[in-house]
A protein has these predicted regions:
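A short, structured active-site edge motif that brings together acidic residues
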Residues: 40, 122-137
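Short beta->alpha linker loops
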Residues: 44, 82-86, 107, 165, ...
Length: 196
């Protein structure tokens, strides 16, 4: 029997979380003396935070910047977010047609659960897998994907795929050995997805 497992990225795929993430990034950068307009920080949406903050500061400052990001995001940023139009209907249709749905995000798992719960989307997913919050390799996309596949009990990788908007989703899916699909309404470009 086919398993038909679909893993979804969260930010830029299920919800438009850009404003909250970009403002939290601005808040964190400002704490380290870097001034940027929040609307210029769209490249923070999707990739792991250590990668994006690494473009602005030395490695030893990154954990502190991530902590600053989380202060803003936990207080305000997570609410500067909304599901993309049609997402609820898509999830409903997929679920009714026997697809098993999971989330695989680089966002903190606890925050992903909170966001999806707030918007009433959590019940569509068998599991919501995200970064553990300890800034380890466990939060890397391929590892989050593998965690979701493990929770799914997936025995046939050809029956699983990930849907996302950034190269990290596509690269992570390929490294995990599953099919990938890029969406163009999020924060990644066609070129970024094609080059992954």
């Amino acid at each position: 029997m086919q398993e038909r497992i679909i893993l979804f990225d969260l930010d830029g795929t299920l919800t438009d979380s850009g404003p909250g993430i970009m403002k939290a990034s601005q808040f964190a950068l400002r704490a380290y003396g870097v001034e940027r307009d929040w609307q210029e920080l769209d490249f923070f949406v999707g990739p792991p935070l250590d990668e994006t903050f690494g473009q602005f500061m030395p490695k030893e400052d990154i954990p502190g910047a991530i902590d600053q990001f989380r202060v803003y995001y936990h207080d305000v940023g997570w609410l500067e977010n909304e599901p993309y139009p049609g997402v609820r209907e898509m999830l409903d249709t997929l679920q009714k047609n026997g697809f098993r749905l999971f989330v695989a995000t680089s966002k903190l798992e606890s925050m992903a659960v909170q966001v999806l719960g707030h918007f009433g989307l959590a019940p569509y997913f068998e599991a919501i897998c995200g970064a553990p919050g300890d800034n380890t390799q466990a939060g890397k996309k391929v590892n989050v994907i593998r965690a979701a596949l493990q929770k799914a009990g997936c025995t046939d990788l050809t029956q699983a795929m990930i849907l996302g908007d950034r190269k990290h989703d596509i690269i992570g899916g390929k490294l995990a050995g599953i099919r990938t699909a890029g969406i163009l309404y999020g924060y990644g470009s066609r070129e970024e997805l094609a080059q992954a």
